[in-house]
Amino acid sequence: MIKELDTVVLSRDLSEHSLKRGDIGAVVHSYKEGKAFEIEFITGQGDTVTVATLNSEDVRLMQGKEILHVRKLQAA
């Protein structure tokens, strides 16, 4: 179950925010017993890209054996 402060992985592209499936975010708030979340996505330097309200099917928990990947953020 996803909870506040968990690291999550985006399950689909969010082109309106220049985010792609696989991007990493942090849960900053949970709604409706975990059916929706406020997720903050940041750059490698810690600048906020966006805070998006997403449904539980839009994200998944990051797994322990996964590795991060870097890509350049494209303007929306």
Q: Can you say where each PLM-predicted feature lies in the sequence?
A:
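Basic/aromatic-rich interaction segments and small domains that mediate binding to polyanionic partners
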Residues: 2-65
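Long, low-complexity intrinsically disordered regions
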Residues: 64-76
